[in-house]
């Protein structure tokens, strides 16, 4: 196995860097979330058992997106998402997706019909046409700091070691095969990334949770982070990002992404083009960290989507066949105008408007889809015009 050698001395900094793509083929592969303790490719690829049983694995589904994301790394996305209501799952907004994609939960395929995002975080909620058999409870407390966490993802293999002064201080990120894995960490702090991201949970790669200590990498976005609350594991975060890239000098020409036990002596890109030297001292290691969007900071928005708290409207009351027609009833709000669409193919569409400019009354409104009973089976959805 060839190593990426990084040689550092206090007061001077001399480095020899082997380009990552030349050496990853010789490295031990570790798939999805990365571990300090082992290179076993089968490690934690099944549901946790014992004291960690029912700690979140059962709530994770496969969110397969067709839109190219991070084109240099993968042509499509095979991410994770978490059901949080009978017809809603949550994931990361930056992995995109569309209503032409599918979400697979416990072997059953679900078809998204609508997406909800917010300017305050990297969260995206997707509504599906079908109904989930169960879904994850949300962490509603504010006591995440110092809490043990279960982490789920489908990220990269572990790459080659990053060796500093003869010590393996981390591993580069390799390639991914989208295998789901689980690991453990501890929430070290809550921090705010500002407009568009908001509060995130910070977890460091410092080995404080034993052999299951993990970091996240490319492909882990959208995976859930769970915290135990009164014996119940609740969804507390959605994987967003990790520290890096790193470099041996203050340029980006030889930068690399890595999970670092100790980043001391390396440069880290803190903002695009801005490299900051991590102090190389003997006092304490400087582990890299990963960040997950904080659920508890976004509860008002989440509940407004999954509970329709934006108003009592946009909830389907029922569809009844009356003769050869279908009668679609739905809740409305006053001073709002609606439209109703239908499709015979919820996966590929297209959706056709059967009626528009339906005035809301503050109660149940019924509209008619003429001759629907003699047509192929249809799906309906309601939209807000104003």
Each model region followed by its residue ranges:
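Extracellular/periplasmic catalytic domains that process cell-envelope and extracellular macromolecules
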Residues: 74-75, 82-84, 96-97, 104, ...
